[in-house]
Design a protein with these regions (language model features):
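Metabolite-binding pocket within alpha/beta catalytic cores that recognizes anionic/polar moieties
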Residues: 1-140
Length: 140
């Protein structure tokens, strides 16, 4: 696994014009944030060695480098899911590559529901903990 991570990171380093320390995984509903990224260059997942390819409708399947505001960032437009048949190692592979590239801060977004009656459509929720019901632990 480490060799694959290093191979993928080396490929991306050869394409990168900046050295971002912040990354965003754009989940369902936030893919349009990619339109706010300036000075961007995109790499399709299919072009990246060892990278899985998203099969979810609406996930564009691109890694985007550029600026959001004045900050150099890396963004994943589309991600991979356990329910698509990927192993947890494959699902977490991009995050491991990000770490190898020097990413220090990662924002992960998704569409979600809540049982709290005070929540309204469009509210932002910050996850402080989670329950793992997956048969395969994502941190292995």
């Amino acid at each position: 696994m480490l060799e694959r991570i290093q191979e993928t990171a080396a490929f991306l380093k050869g394409k990168m014009h900046t050295q971002p320390e912040t990354a965003i995984i754009l989940g369902t509903g936030l893919g349009s944030l990619a339109g706010e990224i300036t000075e961007k260059y995109e790499i399709r997942y299919e072009e990246i060695p060892n990278f899985p390819v998203s099969t979810v409708e609406g996930h564009s399947g691109k890694l985007i480098f550029g600026k959001l505001g004045h900050k150099d960032i890396m963004a994943m437009q589309g991600r991979f899911h356990f329910y698509e048949g990927y192993s947890m190692k494959e699902v977490t592979f991009p995050v491991r590559v990000m770490r190898e590239l020097g990413i220090k801060t990662l924002f992960v977004s998704n569409a979600s529901g809540g049982t709290n009656p005070d929540f309204a459509i469009g509210d932002l929720m910050i996850i402080t903990d989670h329950i793992n019901y997956f048969p395969e632990h994502p941190l292995r």
